[in-house]
Regions:
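Eukaryotic endomembrane contact-site and trafficking scaffolds
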Residues: 88, 108, 112-131, 142
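Compact, well-ordered interaction domains used in eukaryotic information-processing assemblies
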Residues: 96-97
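Charge-rich, low-hydrophobicity low-complexity segments
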Residues: 1-84, 90-92, 129-178
Length: 178
């Protein structure tokens, strides 16, 4: 669509943010949106890097392309929008209304609170530990080429697992977590 193309053009014009240790962003407060590029194209699975987002506040992060794994630690009021993660997305310490939109084979959520919202497409049930006041919804982020990338990553169809999280702090077989 025209809107998606416009968004992609804006994203492409943004400055790439990374450092030498691994693709991602660290120690950022506010400022312009950050773009982290993963592997693109038909062979993305074999070239996909890990991505690390640490100690971020009050910013937007766009993960474009395919990543092998995603590790988020200590994010406050951060919005993360991303394409496919072939393995695990570990989301630890999301606070103050963080919003994460990600498609991943597995998602583990630790110590999320204060209105964190997770928009997920996963091939397994999300694991939740030591978290409260967290909302879940289906993955909705789009950009041109994302559909093909999701198919190649085995995440093309939404299995609905975003609504079936296992809260390890609430082991009750007959009642959903509060």
């Amino acid at each position: 669509s025209a809107a998606a193309s416009s968004v992609l053009a804006k994203i492409a014009a943004m400055e790439l943010h990374a450092d030498a240790s691994a693709p991602g962003a660290r120690d950022v407060v506010g400022g312009d949106p950050l773009v982290v590029r993963g592997a693109l194209g038909a062979d993305a699975a074999s070239a996909a890097p890990d991505c690390v987002l640490e100690r971020l506040a009050d910013c937007d992060v766009f993960l474009i392309g395919t990543f092998r794994a995603l590790r988020c630690h200590d994010l406050a009021n951060v919005r993360v929008f991303g394409g496919p993660v072939l393995g695990s997305a570990l989301l630890h310490g999301l606070t103050r209304g963080c919003r994460v939109e990600i498609a991943a084979a597995q998602c583990r959520v630790h110590d999320a609170r204060d209105g964190a919202a997770l928009y997920l497409r996963t091939s397994s049930r999300p694991i939740i530990e030591h978290s409260s006041d967290v909302a879940f919804a289906p993955f909705a982020f789009e950009y041109p080429g994302l559909g093909d990338a999701l198919e190649r990553a085995g995440l093309g169809a939404d299995a609905g697992t975003w609504r079936e999280g296992d809260d390890f702090g609430w082991i009750k077989t007959h009642r959903a977590s509060p």
